[in-house]
């Protein structure tokens, strides 16, 4: 919104700052963090009073988790307030990629909120129907992907099929055009990202830091992909307009920092599905917009590992009646093996940093 003040730069030279994505990204980070810091305590106290018993604790989980009983959930509301508030102030709201990303952020956040609401009121882990939840997620993601695809196609950059093509790391010119099926592919990426972060969110601070790492990585990618000079130099696909997504991701990082202040062990609040679905969906949408869907599987490799551990556990148990892991997702397996919660969290953070660096290195390897 504030970018519109650039029109007054003829009279107030300092307003030229608002032209620069880097400045507005930093401002969005600071603003979103400030929003969470200021309103966080009020939101936490309100949720604690309204929820009473807080988020239900799994009976089959590690014994150390029972001391967390009574901790309120839906902390994602704080994160959403920071992201949306800062984005409205600092991002270009006429940018289709920004609007599509915020649509997914709010849409997935609303789904997560309803799921959290059902879990808290029923004091059960059985929230929103799985099929219904996935169906609504796919609709929201599909709408966002469709409009982003149309925008990319209309730009005429890299040919008329660019918007509906899948790009591959290491090869700038190797792309596979799948036509309208790109909406399905992109929807799968976004929904998968949202639910992968959701599965990872099981320990204090475990999900939010890797999310910020991924957001920072994709902030760099979005900025480079949206700049024709850098894109040509690195031989990555130039996608006009995606640089503006760096501002939204700056807001994600700021909101994440603010939330971590309250989520640091012992957590005063959990983000719940409200936050995890929204954050994962946001990262997934940026990956689709910048044509780095496959790279996201590397940068967000920790989330992929967590998801695969659940798929393997469930699939193997259905086939053999036995379990591969002591408990899934895999972070609980290591807890059962004797790792302390802080050991699991910090070691997983280290893995997330390594994977992010590996993912970013693909930008130069062509």
Swiss-Prot record:
<dbReference type="GO" id="GO:0008360">
    <property type="term" value="P:regulation of cell shape"/>
</dbReference>
<feature type="transmembrane region" description="Helical">
    <location>
        <begin position="138"/>
        <end position="158"/>
    </location>
</feature>
<keyword id="KW-0997">Cell inner membrane</keyword>
<keyword id="KW-0133">Cell shape</keyword>
<dbReference type="GO" id="GO:0009252">
    <property type="term" value="P:peptidoglycan biosynthetic process"/>
</dbReference>
<comment type="pathway">
    <text>Cell wall biogenesis; peptidoglycan biosynthesis.</text>
</comment>
<feature type="transmembrane region" description="Helical">
    <location>
        <begin position="268"/>
        <end position="288"/>
    </location>
</feature>
<keyword id="KW-0479">Metal-binding</keyword>
<dbReference type="GO" id="GO:0008963">
    <property type="term" value="F:phospho-N-acetylmuramoyl-pentapeptide-transferase activity"/>
</dbReference>
<dbReference type="Pfam" id="PF00953">
    <property type="entry name" value="Glycos_transf_4"/>
</dbReference>
<dbReference type="GO" id="GO:0005886">
    <property type="term" value="C:plasma membrane"/>
</dbReference>
<feature type="transmembrane region" description="Helical">
    <location>
        <begin position="71"/>
        <end position="91"/>
    </location>
</feature>
<dbReference type="InterPro" id="IPR000715">
    <property type="entry name" value="Glycosyl_transferase_4"/>
</dbReference>
<feature type="transmembrane region" description="Helical">
    <location>
        <begin position="27"/>
        <end position="47"/>
    </location>
</feature>
<dbReference type="GO" id="GO:0051301">
    <property type="term" value="P:cell division"/>
</dbReference>
<dbReference type="Pfam" id="PF10555">
    <property type="entry name" value="MraY_sig1"/>
</dbReference>
<feature type="transmembrane region" description="Helical">
    <location>
        <begin position="205"/>
        <end position="225"/>
    </location>
</feature>
<protein>
    <recommendedName>
        <fullName>Phospho-N-acetylmuramoyl-pentapeptide-transferase</fullName>
        <ecNumber>2.7.8.13</ecNumber>
    </recommendedName>
</protein>
<comment type="function">
    <text>Catalyzes the initial step of the lipid cycle reactions in the biosynthesis of the cell wall peptidoglycan: transfers peptidoglycan precursor phospho-MurNAc-pentapeptide from UDP-MurNAc-pentapeptide onto the lipid carrier undecaprenyl phosphate, yielding undecaprenyl-pyrophosphoryl-MurNAc-pentapeptide, known as lipid I.</text>
</comment>
<keyword id="KW-0460">Magnesium</keyword>
<feature type="transmembrane region" description="Helical">
    <location>
        <begin position="294"/>
        <end position="314"/>
    </location>
</feature>
<keyword id="KW-0131">Cell cycle</keyword>
<dbReference type="GO" id="GO:0046872">
    <property type="term" value="F:metal ion binding"/>
</dbReference>
<keyword id="KW-0472">Membrane</keyword>
<keyword id="KW-1003">Cell membrane</keyword>
<keyword id="KW-0573">Peptidoglycan synthesis</keyword>
<comment type="similarity">
    <text>Belongs to the glycosyltransferase 4 family. MraY subfamily.</text>
</comment>
<feature type="transmembrane region" description="Helical">
    <location>
        <begin position="174"/>
        <end position="194"/>
    </location>
</feature>
<keyword id="KW-0812">Transmembrane</keyword>
<feature type="transmembrane region" description="Helical">
    <location>
        <begin position="245"/>
        <end position="265"/>
    </location>
</feature>
<dbReference type="InterPro" id="IPR018480">
    <property type="entry name" value="PNAcMuramoyl-5peptid_Trfase_CS"/>
</dbReference>
<dbReference type="InterPro" id="IPR003524">
    <property type="entry name" value="PNAcMuramoyl-5peptid_Trfase"/>
</dbReference>
<dbReference type="GO" id="GO:0071555">
    <property type="term" value="P:cell wall organization"/>
</dbReference>
<keyword id="KW-0961">Cell wall biogenesis/degradation</keyword>
<keyword id="KW-1133">Transmembrane helix</keyword>
<feature type="transmembrane region" description="Helical">
    <location>
        <begin position="343"/>
        <end position="363"/>
    </location>
</feature>
<keyword id="KW-0808">Transferase</keyword>
<keyword id="KW-0132">Cell division</keyword>
<feature type="transmembrane region" description="Helical">
    <location>
        <begin position="93"/>
        <end position="113"/>
    </location>
</feature>
<dbReference type="GO" id="GO:0051992">
    <property type="term" value="F:UDP-N-acetylmuramoyl-L-alanyl-D-glutamyl-meso-2,6-diaminopimelyl-D-alanyl-D-alanine:undecaprenyl-phosphate transferase activity"/>
</dbReference>
């Amino acid at each position: 919104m504030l970018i519109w003040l650039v029109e007054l730069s003829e009279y107030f030279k300092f307003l030229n700052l608002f032209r620069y994505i880097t400045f507005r990204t930093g401002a969005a980070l600071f603003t979103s963090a400030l929003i969470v810091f200021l309103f966080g305590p009020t939101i936490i106290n309100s949720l604690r009073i309204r929820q009473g018993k807080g988020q239900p604790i799994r009976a089959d989980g590690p014994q150390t988790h029972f001391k967390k009983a009574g901790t309120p959930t839906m902390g994602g509301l704080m994160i959403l307030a920071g992201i949306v508030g800062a984005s409205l102030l600092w991002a270009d709201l006429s940018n289709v990629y920004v609007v599509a990303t915020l649509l997914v952020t709010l849409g997935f956040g609303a789904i997560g909120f309803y799921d959290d609401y059902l879990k808290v009121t029923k004091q059960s882990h059985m929230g929103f129907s799985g099929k219904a939840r996935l169906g609504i997620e796919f609709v929201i993601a599909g709408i966002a992907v469709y409009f982003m695809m149309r925008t990319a196609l209309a730009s005429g950059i890299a040919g008329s099929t660019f918007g509906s093509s899948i790009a591959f790391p290491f090869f700038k010119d190797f792309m596979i055009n799948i036509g309208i099926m790109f909406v399905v592919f992109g929807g799968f990426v976004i929904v998968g990202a949202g639910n992968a972060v959701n599965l990872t969110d099981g320990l204090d601070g475990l999900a939010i830091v890797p999310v910020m790492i991924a957001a920072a990585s994709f902030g760099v990618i979005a900025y480079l992909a949206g700049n024709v000079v850098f894109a040509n130099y690195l031989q990555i696909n130039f996608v006009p307009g995606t640089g503006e997504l760096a501002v939204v991701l700056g807001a994600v990082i700021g909101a994440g920092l603010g939330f971590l202040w309250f989520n640091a062990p012992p957590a005063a609040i959990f983000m719940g599905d409200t936050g995890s679905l929204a954050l994962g969906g946001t990262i997934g949408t940026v990956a689709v917009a910048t044509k780095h869907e496959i790279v996201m599987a590397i940068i967000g490799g920790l989330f992929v590992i967590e998801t695969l551990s659940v798929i393997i556990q469930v699939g193997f148990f259905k086939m053999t009646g036995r379990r591969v892991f002591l408990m899934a997702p895999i972070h609980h397996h290591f807890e059962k093996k004797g790792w302390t919660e802080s050991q699991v969290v910090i070691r997983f953070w280290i893995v997330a940093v390594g994977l992010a660096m590996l993912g970013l290195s693909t930008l130069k390897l062509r």
